[in-house]
Amino acid sequence: MTARNLAEWQNFVQGCIDFRPNDGVYRIARDMFTEPELFELEMELIFEKVWIYACHESEIPNNNDFVTVQIGRQPMIVSRDGKGELHAMVNACEHRGATLTRVAKGNQSVFTCPFHAWCYKSDGRLVKVKAPGEYCEDFDKSSRGLKQGRIASYRGFVFVSLDTQATDSLEDFLGDAKVFLDLMVDQSPTGELEVLQGKSAYTFAGNWKLQNENGLDGYHVSTVHYNYVSTVQHRQQVNAAKGDELDTLDYSKLGAGDSETDDGWFSFKNGHSVLFSDMPNPTVRPGYNTVMPYLVEKFGEKRAEWAMHRLRNLNLYPSLFFMDQISSQLRIIRPVAWNKTEVISQCIGVKGESSEARRNRIRQFEDFFNVSGLGTPDDLVEFREQQKGFQGRIERWSDISRGYHQWTYGPTQNSQDLGIEPVITGREFTHEGLYVNQHGQWQRLILDGLNKKALKMHDVTFDNQSVMDEV
C-alpha cells in the first residue's frame, strides 16, 4: 500500500463519516479503526494537541512528588517542584535522549540521567553537567532544561497539552462537562477526592476509539453484561430471603428500554459526553446517609439528586472516563497501536470518608470494574471481536443512528436544572447520538490538523518514472 499525501488523507478522513440528518443516516467507516498510518496522525493531531488527562493531584500531594505518564507517543514526568507548582516535562534527557526516570512514581528534588549524569531539578531546570570542562565557555545550562507542555488542574484533575502554541484553557476545553466533575467532588465536605492505592492496567486487542464508544454504550448492558445482571438479581433474591437489602447497584433495568426511568445523555463541545440514568437503589452508594443530607443542605434537592440518585459515565474526550455509578472509577485510555490499547483503571473516592463507606466503595469497584470483576472481561471480548469483524471489508460502514428521531438540539428540563447547554441531548439510555458527537470531533481535529500542515509545507508526490526520464 502506498503512503497517502496530504490531500489524500483529507479526502479519506472526510469520507469516513456519513451524517445525513434529513435522510436519517448516521454511519462511520470501519477503516477508521484499521489504518496503521491513521493511528500516527491521531497521535500527532489529537493526543499530542488537545488536553489529555495525566493524573489526579492526590497522587502527587507533596513537593517534589512525581508520576510518569504517556501523552500520545511522548513519555512525560508530571511533577511538583519544591514550591508545589505543577510541571509536565518530557521524560528524556536533553543530552542524548535517555529517559530520566524509569519508575511509575516517587519523590525526587533532582532527576539524574542514568546515562551521562546530567541533573535536572523537579521543575525541569538543568542544574549540573558531569565533567563540564570539555564544553565551550558559552555552554548555557539555563537554555537546556527539559522541554515542557502546558499543564493545568481542575478540582484536582490534572491535564497536559503538548501544543505549547495553543491558547485554550483547560476550563475552555472541559466546558459544561465540568458540571459532572463537580457532582462528584461536591460529595466531599472538604472538596477533595483521592485516588485509592493500587491500580489495574490491561491491554485489549482493539483500537482506542472502541473504549471511547463503549463507556457511553447503554445499548449493550443487558446483553453483554447479562451474567452480571443475573448475578445481582440472584443476590437480591437471596438477600430478600434473609430479610437483607441488596448492597450493590441494581443493574437489571439499565439498557432495557424502561420508559419509567429518567435516563439519557448529553453531548458537549470538544467531543465530551455523559451517559446518565436514575439509580434504582441509591442508598447503597458509599456514605449515602451522610452525603445526601449534606448535599441537599448545601446545593438543594435537585443537584443532590443528580449527584447521588443518578449514575453517570462521563467521557472527557479522548483520554478519560469518570464513572460514578456502581462505584467510582477513573478509566484512562492510552492508545498503543492501531489495534492495541492500554486502559488504566483506578478507584477514586471522597477524601476522609468513613471506613465503612471506603470498604463499600472498594468492594463495589472490585465487583464490576476490576480486571477480574464481572464487567470488564465482557467488554474486552467485544472489543477484540469488533476489531476482527472490521476486517470484513465487503461492508465498510457501522450504523450509529439508533434513536436519531428523538435526539434534541435545544434545552430540556434536565439541562436547565443543571445549567448546561449540550450540543445534542438524548432522552433514552440506549440511543447512539453520543457517537455522532464523538466521531464528529475526531474528524474535526484531524482535518484541522491536516489543513494546518498543508499551510506549513509544500506536499510533493514524485512519479518515479518521470524522475528517471529526466535523468
UniProtKB/Swiss-Prot annotation:
The anthranilate dioxygenase (AntDO) multicomponent enzyme system is composed of an oxygenase component and a NADH:acceptor reductase component (AntC). The oxygenase component is a heterohexamer of 3 large (AntA) and 3 small (AntB) subunits. SUPFAM superfamilies: Bet v1-like, ISP domain. InterPro entries: Anthranilate_1-2-diOase_lsu (IPR017638), Rieske_2Fe-2S (IPR017941), Rieske_2Fe-2S_sf (IPR036922), Ring-hydroxy_dOase_2Fe2S_BS (IPR015881), Ring_hydroxy_dOase_asu_C_dom (IPR015879), Rng_hydr_dOase-A (IPR001663). [2Fe-2S] cluster binds at C93, H95, C113, H116. The gene is antA. Changing D217E: Loss of dioxygenase activity and lack of iron at the mononuclear site. GO terms for biological process: catabolic process. Residues 52-160 form the Rieske domain. This is Anthranilate 1,2-dioxygenase large subunit. Pathway: Aromatic compound metabolism; anthranilate degradation via hydroxylation; catechol from anthranilate: step 1/1. Component of anthranilate dioxygenase multicomponent enzyme system which catalyzes the incorporation of both atoms of molecular oxygen into anthranilate to form catechol. Optimum pH is 6.3 for the reverse reaction. It catalyses: anthranilate + NADH + O2 + 3 H(+) = catechol + NH4(+) + CO2 + NAD(+); anthranilate + NADPH + O2 + 3 H(+) = catechol + NH4(+) + CO2 + NADP(+). PROSITE patterns: RIESKE, RING_HYDROXYL_ALPHA. Binds 1 Fe cation per subunit. Binds 1 [2Fe-2S] cluster per subunit. The keyword Iron applies. Its EC number is 1.14.12.1. Belongs to the bacterial ring-hydroxylating dioxygenase alpha subunit family. Keywords: 2Fe-2S, Aromatic hydrocarbons catabolism, Dioxygenase, Iron, Iron-sulfur, Metal-binding, NAD, Oxidoreductase.
